[in-house]
Amino acid sequence: MASALTTQGTAITMKQLLEAGVHFGHQTKRWNPKMKPYIFGARNGIYIIDLQKTVGLARGALRFVSDAVAKGGMVLFVGTKKQAQDAIREEASRSGQYHVTNRWLGGTLTNFKTVKQGIDRLKTIEKMAADGTYERLPKKEVAQLEREREKLEKNLGGIKEMSRLPAAIFVIDTKKEHIAVHEANRLGIPVVAVVDTNCDPEGIEYVIPGNDDAIRSIRLFTGKIAEACIEGRARYSTWAAQHGEERRPGEEDRDAASERGQKDRRDRRDRRGGGRDRERREPREDRAAASANVEVVRKGEVTPAQPAPGSDANR
């Protein structure tokens, strides 16, 4: 099934990126050299991310997510830092996907069988509360069960309906969520992530260079991924209605997705520093916006974004 990101919700433009402050990286002294291909330059001690590359890579990531969901897969949204929690929770819920916002439990993917036991326990307690079992138990025991339920809900509530491994994971801040990325890599699950100038892009099949601290930037990318999921689900529903059966992504789907991720990384390496390929890939209006952005940076008119509440003030 061919991808068709045609709706306004999944479109991403240079203007949106600029308004959200996506181009502001970290201080030059806090960078990861592996992010050099995605950096336009530095201004006032802060790295400026090449938004022209961000636009192209983001569009590729959105196409992949839409295709994965259209095949019956699910996406796990991961973002446990304070400024990402609300956006991750809201957008994952809106698009009917899974999410982790409290903390990543080691083995969530690689030891899912054990994690599933915790999920089953949570559902059991919820059933006890709903069917009147609580009314027949001593108050002390009910209080203990409620404390257990609250703890399980806090850690596992976002993946309560996850009966199998996701087709992909979407991550905000790969440096903080390195364990999640590592587990996904071990299982061959493609990783889509917003990667800032202080992060390591290795192991990320779909790198989206951008500010992973500013709330507006986080909400922009999380919302776009959610829209891609919604579009993918609509395509899946259409297919299921036409064929009268349900598709479930098997191991071959994840292998194919992993191969696509490896090919995508090779393509990105080939494109690094290549302006002609980039011009063929980008619409004319985005190239014009990129030129305007470059001119603003050269004139020194870039003003560093204010740190988001709860974020590191020394970016």
Swiss-Prot record:
<dbReference type="GO" id="GO:0003735">
    <property type="term" value="F:structural constituent of ribosome"/>
</dbReference>
<comment type="similarity">
    <text>Belongs to the universal ribosomal protein uS2 family.</text>
</comment>
<keyword id="KW-0689">Ribosomal protein</keyword>
<dbReference type="InterPro" id="IPR001865">
    <property type="entry name" value="Ribosomal_uS2"/>
</dbReference>
<dbReference type="GO" id="GO:0022627">
    <property type="term" value="C:cytosolic small ribosomal subunit"/>
</dbReference>
<dbReference type="Pfam" id="PF00318">
    <property type="entry name" value="Ribosomal_S2"/>
</dbReference>
<keyword id="KW-0687">Ribonucleoprotein</keyword>
<feature type="region of interest" description="Disordered">
    <location>
        <begin position="241"/>
        <end position="315"/>
    </location>
</feature>
<protein>
    <recommendedName>
        <fullName>Small ribosomal subunit protein uS2</fullName>
    </recommendedName>
</protein>
<dbReference type="InterPro" id="IPR023591">
    <property type="entry name" value="Ribosomal_uS2_flav_dom_sf"/>
</dbReference>
<dbReference type="InterPro" id="IPR005706">
    <property type="entry name" value="Ribosomal_uS2_bac/mit/plastid"/>
</dbReference>
<feature type="compositionally biased region" description="Basic and acidic residues">
    <location>
        <begin position="243"/>
        <end position="288"/>
    </location>
</feature>
<dbReference type="GO" id="GO:0006412">
    <property type="term" value="P:translation"/>
</dbReference>
<dbReference type="InterPro" id="IPR018130">
    <property type="entry name" value="Ribosomal_uS2_CS"/>
</dbReference>
